[in-house]
Regions:
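Long, charged, low-complexity intrinsically disordered regions
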Residues: 1-81
Length: 81
C-alpha cells in the first residue's frame, strides 16, 4: 500500500463477497486515502468488473471511477470529507 492508495484484490470472489470487501474498505478508508484500486481480473473478471463499476459509480463516498490501462483494475477515486 502506498500513501493515499489502497489495493483490494477481489479475484475469485462472487458479487456478494466483493461487495462486502469493498464496502469494508470504503468504511475504513481514512482521510489520507483518496483512491481504492480494485483488482478484479480481466478474462474471468469481466462480469465482476461491470458489476463493480455499475454499483459504485453513484456511491456517496466515490467521486468518480477511473479506468486504467490495465483492464483488470478499476479505481474508485474518493470524495474528500
Amino acid at each position: 500500500m502506498s500513501f493515499g492508495r489502497i489495493e483490494l484484490d477481489v479475484h475469485g470472489m462472487n458479487r456478494h463477497q466483493a461487495t462486502v470487501a469493498i464496502d469494508a474498505k470504503l468504511r475504513r478508508a481514512g482521510r489520507d486515502v483518496y483512491r481504492i484500486s480494485i483488482i478484479h481480473g480481466y478474462n474471468s473478471g469481466c462480469a465482476l468488473r461491470d458489476f463493480i463499476r455499475a454499483t459504485y459509480k453513484n456511491h456517496p463516498k466515490v467521486l468518480r471511477i477511473e479506468l486504467g490501462l490495465n483492464q483488470g483494475v478499476t479505481d474508485l477515486v474518493l470524495r474528500e470529507y
